[in-house]
Amino acid sequence: SIGVDDIRRQINDTIAIRPYSSPYKVYIVDEAEKMTVQAQNALLKTIEEPPSYAVIFLLTTNQDVFLPTILSRCVQIKLKPLKDSQVKEYLLEHLQLKEAEADVYAAFARGNLGKAIRLAASEDFKILHTEMLYLVKNLKTMDISEILMFIRRLKEEDIDLLECLDFMQFWYRDVLMFKVTKDVNLLIFKEEYPSINEISQRSGYEGLENILASIDKARIRLAANVNMELALELMLLVMKEN
């Protein structure tokens, strides 16, 4: 999260210092939806009467989390996401990634090139990728105690739960896609084709729909501050049964 001290230290305490070499002083708050209510209130005092040279960008994918007083004092500029193919092309050309890696980063970025670049350089994301691959490949044979241990490990390693849900949504999307089309080229996780093929053969359409619905329910529960371990346990049990 972005706390009140972050806003005070990085914006409020420095905005009065005039720029030296340009007419504007620009602040960019990435993932601004992570600002706490206290942080938003601290920023509000600044954006009500900013210096004429100051420009503050609040970058977000979810404006609904902002206080109405923040939204009313901002000009909203809506940017369309890039196509996955455009993000992938950039990653291949500029970061020299393997095509299979670029497919995964482009999917997770959801049209946000900056996020794709960050994910490609993130060790935390590589850990998440490894952990989640193990889970989806072995879930059917794991007993309840192993599932609970896995959930606790996610919590201890402070892995991004929303990205975990994204991973599972993309994975089972691939399973369903391959079950319908039998086209490897349509997969996000192309390198995992053998496992995806195996799961698609043993899972029915109704079961896969139940799994995807359970992921959506987990998102809703986490957003409503339901206990994290309970939300994931309920989801994983549905996945195991289907």
Regions found by a protein language model. Name each.
Residues 52-55, 61-167, 171-242:
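Charged, glycine-rich active-site and insertion segments that engage polyanionic ligands
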Residues 6, 38, 42, 167, ...:
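Charged catalytic carboxylate motif
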Residues 13, 45, 68, 72:
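Conserved adenine-binding aromatic site and its adjacent loop/helix in ATP-hydrolyzing domains
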Residues 1-38, 200:
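Clamp-loader machinery-focused feature within the broader ASCE/P-loop NTPase space
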Residues 13-17, 46, 93-94, 163:
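A generic secondary-structure signal
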Residues 16, 41-58:
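Conserved catalytic/switch belt of AAA+ P-loop NTPases
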Residues 30-36, 41-48, 64:
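Catalytic acidic motif of RecA-like/P-loop NTPases
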